[in-house]
C-alpha cells in the first residue's frame, strides 16, 4: 500500500542545528528524508551544484543508467565537470550498463565494485543516499544531510569503497573479452 503524502510529511525526520563553517559564517545543519521524483531530483542537483571540489558517488549497477540516462542529472554532472569538480564514481559495471559507464568515464574517474547495493553521493559539505535505484528512473526517496559529522563519516566510507574498487577500464576489458567474474 503506497504511503500518502500527508503520512510522509508527518513521519519525515528533520533534525537541525547550527554549526560554524570554515569561513566563520553560520550555517544550519540539516538531516532529512526527501520524497518524490521532483523533490529528490532537485535535492541531488542542489547538492551537486553546491560542490566546490569533489563529487563522490557510489551506486549499484543501476546508478550509471540514472546518472547518464536522466537528462537533468547528466546535465548536472556535465556542469560540475566543466566547473572543474573532481568526480569519482563507483558502481558494479555489467554488460547491461557498460555503455552508460563509458559515457560517465568522459567526465568522471570510474571504478568497479562487485555486489554494490543502493546509492550515495558525498561532496565536501553534503551527503545524499538512497536504498533503492531503478534503471533510468528518478529516485523516489533519499536521505539528505549537510551535518558536518555525517558528511565526514560518509567521506571515509566512500574512500574505503574507492580503495577496494578496481579501475573501470579493467572491468570493461574483462566484459568485452568475455571473462566471467566468479
Language model features: what each stretch is:
Residues 45-54, 182:
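Secondary-structure "cap/kink" motif recognition
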Residues 36-43:
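A short, well-structured juxtamembrane/interface segment
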Residues 53-59, 87-89:
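A short, Trp-centered hydrophobic/proline-enriched beta-strand micro-motif
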Residues 1-30, 41, 63-182:
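PLD/PLD-like phosphodiesterase catalytic module centered on the HKD motif
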Residues 31-35:
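Short amphipathic
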Amino acid at each position: 500500500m503506497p504511503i500518502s503524502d500527508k503520512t510522509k510529511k508527518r513521519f519525515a525526520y528533520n533534525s537541525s542545528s547550527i554549526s560554524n563553517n570554515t569561513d566563520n559564517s553560520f550555517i544550519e545543519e540539516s538531516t532529512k528524508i526527501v520524497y518524490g521524483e521532483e523533490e529528490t531530483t532537485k535535492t541531488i542537483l542542489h547538492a551537486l551544484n553546491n560542490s566546490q571540489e569533489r563529487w563522490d558517488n557510489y551506486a549499484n549497477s543501476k546508478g550509471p543508467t540514472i546518472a547518464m540516462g536522466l537528462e537533468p542529472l547528466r546535465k548536472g554532472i556535465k556542469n560540475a565537470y566543466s566547473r572543474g569538480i573532481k568526480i569519482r564514481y563507483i558502481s558494479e559495471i555489467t554488460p547491461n550498463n557498460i555503455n552508460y559507464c563509458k559515457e560517465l568515464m568522459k567526465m568522471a574517474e570510474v571504478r568497479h565494485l562487485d555486489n554494490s547495493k543502493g546509492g550515495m553521493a558525498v561532496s565536501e559539505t553534503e551527503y545524499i543516499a538512497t536504498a533503492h535505484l531503478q534503471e533510468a528512473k528518478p529516485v523516489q526517496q533519499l536521505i539528505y544531510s549537510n551535518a558536518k559529522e555525517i558528511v565526514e563519516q560518509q567521506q571515509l566510507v566512500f574512500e574505503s569503497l574507492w580503495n577496494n574498487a578496481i579501475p573501470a577500464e579493467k572491468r570493461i576489458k574483462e566484459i568485452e573479452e568475455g571473462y566471467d567474474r566468479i
